[in-house]
Amino acid sequence: MVKTILYKDTARWTLEKGFDALTEAVAVTLGPKGRNIVLEKKFGAPQIVNDGVTIAKEIELEDPAENTGISLLRQAASKTNDVAGDGTTTAIVLAHAMLKEGLRNVTAGADPLTVKRGIDKATEFVIEKIQEHARPIKDSRDIEQVATISAGNDPEVGRIVAEAMERVGKEGVISLEEGRSTTTELEVTEGMRFDRGYVSPYFVTDPERMEAVLEEPHILITDRKITMVQDLVPILEQIARTGKPLLIIADDIEKEALATLVVNHLRGVLRVAAVKAPGFGAQRKAVLEDIAALTGGQVISEDTGLKLENVRLEMLGKARRAIVTKDDTTIVAEGNEEAVKARIEQIRRQIQEVESSYDKEKLQQRLAKLAGGVAVIKVGAATETELKDRKLRLEDAINATKAAVEEGIVPGGGTTIAHIAPQLEEWAKSQMKDEELTGTMIVARALYAPLRRIADNAGANGAVIVERVRELPFDEGYDAVANKFVNMFEAGIVDPAKVTRSALQNAASIGGMVLTTEGVVVEKPDKQAKAPAGVGPGPGEGFDY
């Protein structure tokens, strides 16, 4: 493939064009009065979204060099989403502001590496200040506020997420399901999540979210290594006749057996997902017994003399739903309350009997997983388009509340970093000089960008709002809904410190990397012969089969 090489300023300006295109599309969604974006889908109805990372994933330009800029900025959003689960739009707005300011200086002759060093030092300073000002989560009211703000100022979402967290605990599992009515409901059921993901990505059923979702699956639980596919054939044939999917939890699955399962899954013969058993040694056996109690199945173990080839359908566990990602597996079960209660009592007795603090801790972890259950939020909406948007908002809200529990909360609406900016300027002028000072000031000026954008989206003058906020005490800021200045904690406008920190870290990382870029190598697009004017697709043409 023929390549195009761009150098120095041309390379940086081309990347910036991609940055501009993506930022303009994503930044309009920022804040409580942010607008929506409509995404055209090749198959199915268009999707209306308000979620930064979802929009970023969909944008692709014709120019491959500009597209490279989009991919780089998308990384800042994706990384923020992976770490904190929210704050993707803020990360994009910050990275764009740093890049615009930085490119101006580099073009004027500043040394990119020294400027980047200044950006890195400034980022460390701001992160320290964010952690200093973070307040721990006190009660469910704090959780409700965080969830409401994260869901785009939707109080109903805030209430449901806070109730879910109250019922399953701060470490509990909250799962989303598509409901069958127009109202969003909360249900707490038996269930468990463990930290083992699918052994092959070919088991994925939802490629957009990279999840394997199995509805009403049978569950094969074994502490044995599956080496020969012949061992599985009898039970696979029985399951195929039921038409239900299968989740395999095993010690390990050898290549030959795994390949057969993948091929059957891809051909649609049998929907299946396989994960490795959680825990180690004796601990693993106990966790498998917990899963068996939860799902009403048996552990197929050598200790009990059971062999895989002799397994019958009634020995398998059952669940309402199983969701498997690359990192963990969530089982939503129901109808085995008595067995689960008996198992919980057994673990409680063991906790009282053991003396080792390590064993006690592991037993308590198992108890929490079994007793906590799973909060299932059934998302309701009038149309499928609204349902998808609501699901994304709920997902953001759940992630934001978990981030808030971890690192605390800070004043929201871009206020925290806007208040830290003058402190950064003061510190930089006393500690930095020359081009390092330039790098630090780039970050200081970029810190106002999210607040400015929130105000602009609310129909106010962003520059005026920024100047007013600079004069206010740290806890006070701009309420875009009411268009007035308030105490952010009292008004319930709060952000998780982890989200703000991650957005800044990833924005600075991408911004700094682009500033130090001296060349871009991209594939030259093929200039394909265009059809003569007026010639449209004939019968059977122009469709993807």
Curated annotation (Swiss-Prot):
User: Quick one: a GO biological-process term for this protein?
Assistant: protein refolding
Q: What is its EC number?
A: 5.6.1.7
Gene3D superfamilies membership: GroEL, GroEL-like equatorial domain, TCP-1-like chaperonin intermediate domain
Question: Region Disordered: what ranges?
Answer: 526-545
Question: Pfam families given for it?
Answer: Cpn60_TCP1
Binding-site residues, ATP: T29, L30, G31, P32, D86, G87, T88, T89, T90, G413, D479, A480, V481, D495
Q: Could you tell me where the Gly residues compositional bias lies?
A: 535-545
Q: Which UniProt keywords apply?
A: ATP-binding, Chaperone, Cytoplasm, Isomerase, Nucleotide-binding, Plasmid
What are this entry's molecular-function GO terms?
ATP binding; ATP-dependent protein folding chaperone; isomerase activity; unfolded protein binding
Identify one Gene Ontology CC term for this UniProt entry. cytoplasm
Where is this gene product found?
Answer: Cytoplasm
Q: Where is the signal peptide?
A: none
The catalytic activity, as recorded, is: ATP + H2O + a folded polypeptide = ADP + phosphate + an unfolded polypeptide
Q: Which InterPro entries match?
A: Chaperonin_Cpn60_CS, Cpn60/GroEL, Cpn60/GroEL/TCP-1, GroEL-like_apical_dom_sf, GROEL-like_equatorial_sf, TCP-1-like_intermed_sf
Assembly, in brief, is: Forms a cylinder of 14 subunits composed of two heptameric rings stacked back-to-back. Interacts with the co-chaperonin GroES.
This chain's function reads: Together with its co-chaperonin GroES, plays an essential role in assisting protein folding. The GroEL-GroES system forms a nano-cage that allows encapsulation of the non-native substrate proteins and provides a physical environment optimized to promote and accelerate protein folding.
Q: Which family does it belong to?
A: Belongs to the chaperonin (HSP60) family.
Task: Please identify the protein, giving its name as recorded.
Answer: Chaperonin GroEL 3
Print the organism lineage.
Bacteria, Bacillati, Cyanobacteriota, Cyanophyceae, Nostocales
